[in-house]
Amino acid sequence: MGTKPIDILVLPDSHAHPEYNNERFSWFGKFAHDLKPDVIVNIGDLADMASLCFHSKPVELEGARYRADCDVSLDAQERIFHELRRHKKKLPRCVWTLGNHDIRPQRWADANPVFQGAVKNEDIGYGDYPWEVYPFLESVDIAGVDFVHYATSGLMGRPIGGQHAAWTLIKKRNKSTVVGHSHVTDYKIDLSPGRSLMGLVCGSYIDYQAGYAGVANDMWSRGVAVLRNVQDGLYDLEWISLPRLKAEYGA
């Protein structure tokens, strides 16, 4: 056995967007304050950065929309850390594994070199808060569990997904792994002889209906994951729904 077990609170894809309110981040901060986890993992895509969407019409940088995207990301983080800092308690270790939306600024600057240095990932504000930031697709091992926005497979580097995504994570990576990205939840425990592994796709933390997603909105799991007694890649999983957090902390 390794070191003593720890508790990890996972913030799934939360997509702060200027057209929708950020109250859910205050609820998350209050819950985290009461829970007192050893580690908080933001699995990525806290920032939506809709102004830099590469999937719609050709992107033209509109300064006001870009600033609004950055500001709403900053506001989301401020709401979380305002609650965590109440009573001047020691903060948990705070980890952010950057997602594909979080890195849209740098992708846009790479495609438009004249803006190199003027438009950058740091604009979403993670440097203003005590995050331990990991680059997009770089995993971090915490108590034997890998955390990454999404894991890839094959020569094309496609996200591991599908109907049995958690099981595929275990088979492809041979390690307990937690990912986000798909906004759905899937969970698998493999207790095969000689190994014990756990795979988790952790859903979303979005309380609005995303216009681009259509009927897929109804498939999204909305809440947070609590990994209790994490040690050597194993843990006890708890799921706290977003409606429950709103009922308890939204007053």
Language-model regions: role of each:
Residues 1-78:
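N-terminal active-site segment of His-dependent metallophosphoesterases
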Residues 5, 36-38, 91-93, 173-174, ...:
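A general structural motif
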Residues 26-28, 57-60, 112-115, 193-197:
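Glycine-rich, phosphate-binding/catalytic loops in enzymes
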Residues 40, 94-96, 199:
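Hydrophobic/aromatic residues located in beta-strands of well-ordered beta-sheets
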Residues 72-178, 182-193:
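Conserved catalytic scaffold of divalent metal-dependent phosphoesterases
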